[in-house]
Swiss-Prot record:
Gene source species: Buchnera aphidicola subsp. Schizaphis graminum (strain Sg)
Nucleotide-binding in keyword set: no
Cofactor note: Binds 1 [4Fe-4S] cluster.
Domain HhH per the UniProt entry, residue ranges: 108-127
InterPro entries cross-referenced by the UniProt entry: DNA_glycosylase, Endonuclease-III-like_CS2, HhH-GPD_domain, HhH_base_excis_C, HhH_motif, Nth
Protein name as catalogued: Endonuclease III
EC number per UniProt: 4.2.99.18
Cross-referenced NCBIfam families: nth
């Protein structure tokens, strides 16, 4: 895909949604961190359902630590990998309380030192909370980038590096959310909605439906 076509695609996304938002519901930095940790291998809908209850009980490092591992497991048991996620959340809460003065770290190295926080999670946190032009590549972004021909790559790191290089700075903060929403509701894994897709004419996918 050439530079001109990419710019047209991004311009159409901007025209349709000039201020895309993450679909996770949160009211503090720590709540977002927990929500993103919980979202691994799960849906935002499921995470929001769980945190709607959990955050009324515990939504700070102190209250999570007071809640403890077993009770935390009880609140998130309907989500995948809940044992691992419970342990990661407890350990991350401890580090944030003891090492980072109860504040979510604002740089990648410190973020990725937290249990349960990998590159994708760090990219989301840096983008949403700290206004950084990071591009998190999840399954939706990976699919849309490859399928449309926008930024092809064999793995998420390859796609991320390519997108960082080719996406103009004015669009960098938004492109993750545009592609996530597009992959979630239009360019889905199986039920493609090409006939109603607003970038269909620019898309280079050769098996449109």
């Amino acid at each position: 895909m050439n530079k001109k076509k990419r710019f047209e695609i991004l311009s159409l996304f901007y025209k349709k949604n000039s201020n895309p938002k993450i679909e996770l519901v949160f009211s503090s930095d720590f709540e977002l961190l927990l929500s993103v940790i919980l979202s691994a291998k799960s849906t935002d809908v499921m995470v929001n359902k769980i945190t709607g209850t959990l955050f009324q009980i515990a939504n700070t490092p102190q209250s999570i630590l007071k809640l403890g591992f077993n009770k935390l497991r009880h609140y998130i048991k309907s989500i995948g990998l809940y044992n691992t996620k419970s342990l990661n959340i407890i350990n991350s809460a401890y580090l944030i309380k003891t090492k980072y003065n109860n504040k979510v770290p604002s740089n990648r190295t410190e973020l990725e030192s937290l249990p349960g926080v990998g590159r994708k999670t760090a990219n989301i946190i840096l983008n949403v909370l700290f206004n950084k032009n990071t591009i998190a590549v999840d399954t939706h972004v990976f699919r849309v980038a490859n399928r449309t021909g926008f930024a092809k790559g064999k793995n998420v790191i390859e796609v991320e590096k390519k997108m960082i290089k080719i996406v103009p700075s004015i669009f960098k903060k938004y492109v993750h959310f545009w592609f996530v929403l597009h992959g979630r509701y239009v360019c889905t894994a199986r039920q493609l909605k090409c006939k109603t897709c607003f970038i269909e004419k620019l898309c280079e996918f050769d098996k449109k439906k």
